[in-house]
A protein has these predicted regions:
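Nucleic-acid endo/exonuclease domains
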Residues: 1-152
Length: 152
């Protein structure tokens, strides 16, 4: 893989990942979002934040060596830069996020503090509510686009 293109897996997550890969689910969610909301989400792109103030500075498919130290980088599951609704990030949280709550909350705070509309899909919470991931995603996206969600 070329040096400039460093995806989450090739950039060090491969050795850390113990649970099931969410790749198939992310591809399915990306396709659903494109079909339903006509938004083009990118999978595993990088989001760079100012280290001191936390505001959003850069969104990039890859990160070069010089940029690595310049910004605080995050690698969200799905990201979209929409003309009408701004930057939207979708995070699919599995069991690891239930154990690393403080880190997950810090991530969410960083995204929201940077003016990003964040959709967090916690798999355990969704199952507990007897919903599907798509149903929860639909509801959260409808909130972002300004259409109320019909709840049971």
């Amino acid at each position: 893989m070329p040096r400039g293109k460093q995806s989450g897996i090739s950039y060090g997550q491969r050795t850390k990942q113990k649970g099931q890969s969410d790749l198939a689910q992310l591809i399915s969610l990306k396709r659903y979002l494109k079909d339903r909301f006509h938004m083009n989400f990118k999978r595993e792109w990088y989001v760079g934040f100012d280290k001191e103030y936390g505001y959003l500075c850069r969104i990039s498919e890859s990160v070069g060596r010089k940029e690595l130290q310049r910004f605080k980088w995050k690698n969200p599951d799905l990201i979209c830069c929409d003309k009408q609704y701004g930057v939207i990030i979708v995070e699919l949280d599995g069991a690891i996020h239930d154990r690393k709550v403080a880190k997950t909350e810090a991530r969410n705070e960083l995204f929201r503090g940077g003016g990003i509309k964040l959709v967090v899909l916690n798999i355990a919470d969704i199952k507990e509510c007897n919903e599907t991931i798509i149903e929860r995603l639909e509801c959260e996206m409808l909130r972002i686009v300004g259409t109320p969600c019909k709840t049971l």
